Amino acid sequence: MTDSQHIENLTINVNLVRLPHLTDYLPNLQTHTTPLEHNNFYHPSNGFYLSQSDVIIRRTIYDLARTAPSSHFAYHRAGPRKQIFYDQQNVRAAIVTCGGLCPGLNTVIRELVVGLWEQYGVREIFGIKAGYRGFYSMDPVRLDVKMVHNWHKRGGTVLETSRGGFDLDKIVNAIQDYGYNQVYIIGGDGTLRGAVKIFNEIRRRKLYVGVAAIPKTVDNDVGIIDRSFGFQTAVEKAQQAISAAHVEAESAPNGIGLVKLMGRSTGHIALYATLSSRDVDCCLIPENEFYLHGKGGLFEFLEDRLKQNGHAVVVVAEGTGQDMIPRTNAEKQVSDESGNPVFLDVGVWLKSELKKWWDVDHKGELFTVKYIDPTYMIRAVTANATDNLYCTLLSHSAIHGVMAGYTGFVAGPINGNYAYIPMDEIADTKNVVDTKDPKWAWVRSITTQPDFQRN
């Protein structure tokens, strides 16, 4: 029997997700041949330029015994187009960072500037200070390649950032007043929801302004795309905290090292840090509820582990167990300027509960809990090599998309290839840990922790 006799042909339909374009409301825009054609650093070969027919399939894995792949959703592939909708001499680009810090922010800013400057010959590039409010309350900073040359070696964001300050009319009025015709927005889910409103208002006013977003969330909780920039750096840096907790726990009788990692609504950092470390005895994430007392609870598991090894390491994501922590009425109402509920410190609470448990069940026996919270250390570091490269590809993808006339989109990888995704589709998505996925099973097989499902 030949190999061909084992092949079964499948027919599928591809549904291309529509991407907003400037010509949707400005149909008479003139096109230009891309400056890349005459750029000394580029020698375009066959396949270098992409077209409308270049797409990326969103879903690539199927169980053919259960689901027939009758249709696929596809997105436009990111990359340079031969015909663009901007004259390089007339581009005025604005770049803004919003929300919390994340490794790689300065790399994204740098590469937006370098990409616009070196690839497309743009000279009017401006940085918006301190987030969305900077559009209307502060003077912009003129950027050039010399200024941003070493920014990728710095943590944080040189442009500064803040939460809140979103005033739609003031922001779009400022975009008009300053004459920006390209706006690059770097931020997380709250920022992306704001970007959708900015894009819709620009479209309503029929302004010649392309809007692109680069998703930023160290928690890796933005949906559709493979991952967010800064995530791999965060997992790498979390190893130091876990190693320190392990040393502390090993160095004391009945020692427990407790590490709180970032992850408001999802436990990706905790999960990947646990898999990478192999020093973790229990990983607690928001997607998998746990309980403290009784059969199959956390305390029973830790008691057995302390009897076996004399020490244990627990990693907990910051959004875990929030409904278990007592709150005052005032605490129940608190939100930050982005509208996110302010979480209580699960690490402080869990440390206290561990000590209460031990004092009741093992009064007089030695016991130590060392709590490590590396949150601000992790998010403030410079990006590692992998994230630096990733930020470069994201930035250049966004530039190529805006130059091609696309607008209201997010640049990001899908199945390892870069695509343009409509902002309104991605803004309200969440990438959460699937506790039925093999990766979570790997965590439990390594730690041997219970599933915390009450019988």
Predicted feature residues:
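Accessory alpha-helical/coil subdomains and C-terminal extensions
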Residues: 174, 185-187, 193-208, 212, ...
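C-terminal non-catalytic interaction/assembly regions of soluble proteins
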Residues: 1-42, 330-455
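Glycine-rich oxoanion-binding loops at beta->alpha junctions
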Residues: 52-87, 133-181, 218, 229-236, ...
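Anionic-ligand anchoring segments at beta-strand to alpha-helix junctions in alpha/beta enzyme folds, i.e.
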Residues: 110-157, 364-369
